[in-house]
UniProtKB/Swiss-Prot annotation:
The gene is rps12. GO terms for cellular component: cytosolic small ribosomal subunit; ribosome. Belongs to the universal ribosomal protein uS12 family. CDD domains: Ribosomal_S23. InterPro entries: NA-bd_OB-fold, Ribosomal_uS12, Ribosomal_uS12_arc, Ribosomal_uS12_euk/arc. HAMAP family: Ribosomal_uS12_A. GO terms for molecular function: rRNA binding; structural constituent of ribosome. It comes from Saccharolobus solfataricus (strain ATCC 35092 / DSM 1617 / JCM 11322 / P2) (Sulfolobus solfataricus). This is Small ribosomal subunit protein uS12. SUPFAM superfamilies: Nucleic acid-binding proteins. With S4 and S5 plays an important role in translational accuracy. Located at the interface of the 30S and 50S subunits.
Length: 147
Protein backbone atom coordinates (compact mmCIF):
# COMPACT_ATOMS: atom_id res chain seq x y z
CA UNK A 1 0.00 0.00 0.00
CA UNK A 2 1.15 3.50 -0.84
CA UNK A 3 1.14 5.96 2.02
CA UNK A 4 -0.89 9.19 1.53
CA UNK A 5 1.07 12.46 1.53
CA UNK A 6 -1.73 14.27 3.36
CA UNK A 7 -1.34 14.71 7.10
CA UNK A 8 -3.81 12.77 9.18
CA UNK A 9 -4.35 13.79 12.76
CA UNK A 10 -6.20 15.90 15.26
CA UNK A 11 -4.06 18.99 14.58
CA UNK A 12 -3.76 18.57 10.79
CA UNK A 13 -6.42 21.14 9.78
CA UNK A 14 -4.06 24.08 9.21
CA UNK A 15 -1.66 21.99 7.16
CA UNK A 16 -4.50 20.58 5.04
CA UNK A 17 -5.95 24.05 4.47
CA UNK A 18 -2.62 25.53 3.38
CA UNK A 19 -2.11 22.60 1.03
CA UNK A 20 -5.49 23.30 -0.63
CA UNK A 21 -4.65 27.01 -1.05
CA UNK A 22 -1.83 26.11 -3.44
CA UNK A 23 -4.35 24.72 -5.96
CA UNK A 24 -6.78 27.64 -5.91
CA UNK A 25 -5.41 29.21 -9.10
CA UNK A 26 -6.74 26.28 -11.10
CA UNK A 27 -10.32 27.06 -9.99
CA UNK A 28 -12.25 29.16 -12.49
CA UNK A 29 -14.17 31.29 -9.97
CA UNK A 30 -11.07 32.09 -7.92
CA UNK A 31 -9.06 33.08 -10.98
CA UNK A 32 -11.84 35.36 -12.25
CA UNK A 33 -12.04 37.06 -8.86
CA UNK A 34 -8.29 37.43 -8.29
CA UNK A 35 -7.60 38.82 -11.80
CA UNK A 36 -10.65 41.15 -11.54
CA UNK A 37 -11.96 39.93 -14.90
CA UNK A 38 -15.57 40.84 -14.08
CA UNK A 39 -14.70 44.52 -13.59
CA UNK A 40 -12.54 44.56 -16.72
CA UNK A 41 -14.81 42.86 -19.25
CA UNK A 42 -18.37 43.11 -17.92
CA UNK A 43 -20.12 46.20 -19.37
CA UNK A 44 -21.84 46.70 -16.00
CA UNK A 45 -18.45 46.58 -14.26
CA UNK A 46 -19.48 43.91 -11.78
CA UNK A 47 -22.51 45.94 -10.61
CA UNK A 48 -25.99 44.35 -10.41
CA UNK A 49 -27.68 47.16 -12.38
CA UNK A 50 -26.78 50.05 -14.68
CA UNK A 51 -28.40 53.19 -16.09
CA UNK A 52 -28.45 53.87 -19.80
CA UNK A 53 -30.03 55.79 -22.66
CA UNK A 54 -32.09 53.98 -25.32
CA UNK A 55 -30.56 54.40 -28.78
CA UNK A 56 -32.99 52.30 -30.83
CA UNK A 57 -35.58 49.55 -30.66
CA UNK A 58 -34.59 46.27 -32.30
CA UNK A 59 -36.31 42.97 -32.94
CA UNK A 60 -34.14 39.90 -32.44
CA UNK A 61 -35.14 36.55 -33.92
CA UNK A 62 -35.21 33.69 -31.44
CA UNK A 63 -33.16 30.53 -31.92
CA UNK A 64 -34.48 27.21 -33.20
CA UNK A 65 -36.88 25.46 -32.54
CA UNK A 66 -38.75 28.66 -31.57
CA UNK A 67 -39.87 31.23 -34.08
CA UNK A 68 -40.47 34.76 -32.81
CA UNK A 69 -39.18 38.31 -32.94
CA UNK A 70 -38.19 39.25 -29.40
CA UNK A 71 -38.43 42.94 -28.65
CA UNK A 72 -35.15 44.44 -27.46
CA UNK A 73 -33.52 47.85 -27.19
CA UNK A 74 -29.96 49.05 -27.80
CA UNK A 75 -28.80 50.91 -24.70
CA UNK A 76 -25.75 53.13 -24.21
CA UNK A 77 -24.57 52.90 -20.61
CA UNK A 78 -24.02 56.16 -18.75
CA UNK A 79 -21.06 54.91 -16.68
CA UNK A 80 -18.75 53.87 -19.51
CA UNK A 81 -20.45 54.62 -22.84
CA UNK A 82 -20.62 50.98 -23.91
CA UNK A 83 -23.57 49.90 -26.04
CA UNK A 84 -25.45 46.72 -25.08
CA UNK A 85 -28.66 45.00 -26.17
CA UNK A 86 -31.34 44.58 -23.49
CA UNK A 87 -34.52 42.49 -23.66
CA UNK A 88 -37.85 44.18 -22.88
CA UNK A 89 -40.00 41.66 -20.97
CA UNK A 90 -43.79 41.48 -20.96
CA UNK A 91 -46.54 41.74 -23.52
CA UNK A 92 -46.34 45.18 -25.19
CA UNK A 93 -43.49 46.32 -22.94
CA UNK A 94 -41.61 47.90 -25.83
CA UNK A 95 -44.55 50.32 -26.34
CA UNK A 96 -43.65 52.05 -23.06
CA UNK A 97 -40.10 52.73 -24.23
CA UNK A 98 -39.13 55.48 -26.66
CA UNK A 99 -35.74 56.51 -28.02
CA UNK A 100 -33.68 58.68 -25.65
CA UNK A 101 -35.54 57.33 -22.60
CA UNK A 102 -33.49 56.57 -19.50
CA UNK A 103 -33.65 52.90 -18.54
CA UNK A 104 -32.23 50.73 -15.79
CA UNK A 105 -30.94 47.34 -16.96
CA UNK A 106 -29.95 44.22 -15.05
CA UNK A 107 -28.68 40.75 -15.95
CA UNK A 108 -31.19 38.51 -17.72
CA UNK A 109 -30.37 35.56 -15.44
CA UNK A 110 -28.45 33.21 -17.72
CA UNK A 111 -25.75 30.82 -16.54
CA UNK A 112 -22.47 32.55 -15.63
CA UNK A 113 -23.89 35.95 -16.64
CA UNK A 114 -24.57 34.86 -20.20
CA UNK A 115 -27.67 34.96 -22.39
CA UNK A 116 -30.78 32.99 -21.49
CA UNK A 117 -33.24 30.84 -23.39
CA UNK A 118 -33.70 31.42 -27.11
CA UNK A 119 -32.27 34.96 -27.19
CA UNK A 120 -28.85 34.89 -28.84
CA UNK A 121 -26.34 37.44 -27.53
CA UNK A 122 -28.73 39.28 -25.19
CA UNK A 123 -27.45 39.31 -21.61
CA UNK A 124 -29.53 42.09 -20.06
CA UNK A 125 -33.16 43.04 -19.48
CA UNK A 126 -34.91 46.36 -18.86
CA UNK A 127 -36.53 46.80 -15.43
CA UNK A 128 -37.23 50.55 -15.22
CA UNK A 129 -38.09 53.33 -17.66
CA UNK A 130 -37.60 56.99 -16.61
CA UNK A 131 -37.58 55.98 -12.94
CA UNK A 132 -40.80 53.92 -13.08
CA UNK A 133 -40.76 50.12 -13.01
CA UNK A 134 -41.85 48.39 -16.21
CA UNK A 135 -44.12 46.15 -14.13
CA UNK A 136 -46.07 49.16 -12.76
CA UNK A 137 -46.46 50.51 -16.30
CA UNK A 138 -48.02 47.25 -17.63
CA UNK A 139 -50.45 46.99 -14.77
CA UNK A 140 -51.49 50.63 -15.16
CA UNK A 141 -50.51 51.53 -11.60
CA UNK A 142 -48.28 54.38 -12.76
CA UNK A 143 -47.82 56.48 -15.86
CA UNK A 144 -44.53 57.11 -17.57
CA UNK A 145 -43.15 60.56 -16.74
CA UNK A 146 -41.90 62.72 -19.61
CA UNK A 147 -38.17 63.45 -19.41
Amino acid sequence: MVKSKSPKGIYAARKLRLKRLKFRRSQRKYKTKILKLKEKYDPLGGAPMARGIVLEKVGIESRQPNSAVRKCVRVQLVRNGRVVTAFVPGDGGVNFIDEHDEVIITGIGGTLGRSMGDLPGVRYKVIMVNGVSLDALYKGKKQKPVR
